[in-house]
């Protein structure tokens, strides 16, 4: 389903798995080529080390590459199924304050995905996510592998991935 940046921002803000973990979409860039996300430290996501629970950090990174590629490609006429295929995470420092990250998808990445979808029908690529605390300290590095494929002839589009 194609939606505006503002509508998806508010939908994601109140999506229960993100809301309950205090994961807050600050903004989607024009045309869904970027997203800025804040992970707020709270009593609901604190671990015994007084830092943000690793599962919360992982959950924060999970949906966004898939959402961005889905919205970008739908706007360009593609009928696709998109999801996160795999992820790796390295906790570099404890997240003792709020964490922040930004994802940007370049025009080159979009063009590459379009070309591969037109010729092969399936696009798989790994992308980095770096999370920083409020002081600019690098706390987390992730690699998210996005999987995009054309819908099969008899396959119906769903809201979920």
Residue ranges and their predicted role:
Residues 1-20, 44:
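Alpha-helical membrane-targeting segments
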Residues 20, 32, 52, 64, ...:
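Short connector loops at helix/strand junctions that flank enzyme active sites
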Residues 20-52:
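Catalytic strand-loop segment that frames the active site of acyl-thioester-processing enzymes
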Residues 20-25, 85-91, 112-114:
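Short structured motifs
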Residues 35-37, 85-87, 101, 125-127, ...:
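Hydrophobic residues positioned within well-ordered beta-strands of beta-sheet architectures
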Residues 44-66, 79:
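Hot-dog-fold acyl-thioester-processing enzymes
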Residues 68-107:
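Hydrophobic beta-strand-centered segment that forms part of the acyl-chain substrate-binding groove
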Residues 95, 106-161:
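HotDog/MaoC-like acyl-thioester-processing domains
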């Amino acid at each position: 389903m194609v939606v505006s940046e503002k509508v998806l921002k508010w939908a994601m803000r109140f999506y229960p798995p993100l809301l309950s973990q205090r994961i807050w979409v600050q903004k989607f860039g024009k045309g869904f080529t970027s997203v800025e996300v804040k992970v707020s430290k709270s009593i609901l996501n604190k671990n015994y080390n007084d830092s943000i629970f690793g599962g919360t950090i992982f959950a924060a990174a999970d949906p966004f590459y898939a959402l961005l590629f889905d919205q970008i490609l739908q706007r360009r006429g593609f009928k696709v199924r998109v999801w996160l295929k795999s992820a790796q995470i390295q906790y570099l420092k404890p997240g003792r304050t709020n964490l922040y990250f930004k994802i940007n998808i370049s025009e080159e990445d979009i063009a590459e995905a379009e070309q591969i979808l037109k010729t092969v029908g399936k696009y798989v690529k790994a992308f980095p996510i770096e999370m920083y605390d409020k002081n600019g300290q690098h706390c987390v590095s992730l690699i998210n592998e996005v999987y995009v494929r054309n819908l099969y002839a008899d396959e119906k589009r769903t809201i979920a991935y």
